[in-house]
Amino acid sequence: MKITKIHLFHVAMPLIEPWVTAYGNQANIESLFVGIEANGLIGWGECAPAPLPFYNSEYTAGAFYLARDGLGPKIINQTITSADQLTSLFSQFKGNEFAKSAFDTAWWDLYAKEMKTPLWKLIGGNNPEIDVGADIPVQTDVNKLIDRTAEAIELGYGRVKFKFNRQCSFQMMEAVRNSFPDLVMHIDCNSGFTLDDLDLFR
């Protein structure tokens, strides 16, 4: 497929409530959308690093600039027949896996459309549906945390990821587990702890 056009959008989605994590509060979720066009088709990909490099070195504006000035020009007018070839073309750019992943996802979407095959089937999946989870921002009140978890379960989520920082307590997580013993739980600290805190997690 010869890449004839690339579409880039840096967007900010306002949130209903601030997104509280170990590295701070966000009023918006910023994303980079990448569209790769070939043969009259467009494949879409997205990445959503933080608006500033809080928990790793990437951030949304940086991903946009690299996409515009580096990754995009590298593949425009190129005939790309595999994801490995795409990866190889990007090899001179160090790191920046968020930005690269948006192009990779867009290429796979484009390839699936070209092949007229659902992407899940193209990459070896055997089920067109997957379970999704809910995310709950940092909470400092255990009752509110349990209420938010109950709301997620009532909406049909069988998996919940909890944002966690130093203002939270492990007793709160224990209270959630005791209230919902069958819930699949994930705790996301967003690089808010170091190896010096290892004993907290034992």
Q: How should these model regions be labeled?
A:
Residues 1-10, 87-91, 112-113, 117-129:
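N-terminal amphipathic alpha-helix/helix-capping segment at the start of soluble metabolic enzymes
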Residues 1-55:
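Structured beta-strand/loop patches that form or line metal/cofactor-binding pockets in enzymes
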Residues 29, 62, 66, 81, ...:
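Conserved active-site and cofactor/substrate-binding residues in soluble primary-metabolism enzymes
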Residues 33, 109, 149:
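Short glycine-/small-residue-rich flexible loop motifs, especially phosphate/cofactor-binding loops
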Residues 36-37, 42-114:
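Metal- or metallocofactor-binding catalytic centers and their adjacent structured scaffolds
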Residues 121-202:
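Metal-dependent enolase-superfamily TIM-barrel catalytic cores that perform enediolate-based chemistry
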